[in-house]
């Protein structure tokens, strides 16, 4: 499943998200949710323990001035890869 996050982790039910995660899932961070990608983020470290792949949209990272401060465990992607992820996952959930 592709989990598409759009809001800050402080505005999202992160416990519910983590309870739903499976190792084959991907997480895509857009809009304000990209703050989740910051190094040493408590939520990020917990999510990484589920062995899911994490992606953040470069344009949203740049718009918030945090591109240079994100975790090396987060894949920075553009719109083409965003589309690839939506094609890869038939099931998607927006948070």
Swiss-Prot record:
<dbReference type="GO" id="GO:1990228">
    <property type="term" value="C:sulfurtransferase complex"/>
</dbReference>
<dbReference type="InterPro" id="IPR027396">
    <property type="entry name" value="DsrEFH-like"/>
</dbReference>
<dbReference type="Pfam" id="PF04077">
    <property type="entry name" value="DsrH"/>
</dbReference>
<dbReference type="InterPro" id="IPR023526">
    <property type="entry name" value="Sulphur_relay_TusB"/>
</dbReference>
<protein>
    <recommendedName>
        <fullName>Protein TusB</fullName>
    </recommendedName>
</protein>
<keyword id="KW-0963">Cytoplasm</keyword>
<dbReference type="GO" id="GO:0002143">
    <property type="term" value="P:tRNA wobble position uridine thiolation"/>
</dbReference>
<dbReference type="InterPro" id="IPR007215">
    <property type="entry name" value="Sulphur_relay_TusB/DsrH"/>
</dbReference>
<keyword id="KW-0819">tRNA processing</keyword>
<comment type="function">
    <text>Part of a sulfur-relay system required for 2-thiolation of 5-methylaminomethyl-2-thiouridine (mnm(5)s(2)U) at tRNA wobble positions.</text>
</comment>
<comment type="similarity">
    <text>Belongs to the DsrH/TusB family.</text>
</comment>
<comment type="subunit">
    <text>Heterohexamer, formed by a dimer of trimers. The hexameric TusBCD complex contains 2 copies each of TusB, TusC and TusD. The TusBCD complex interacts with TusE.</text>
</comment>
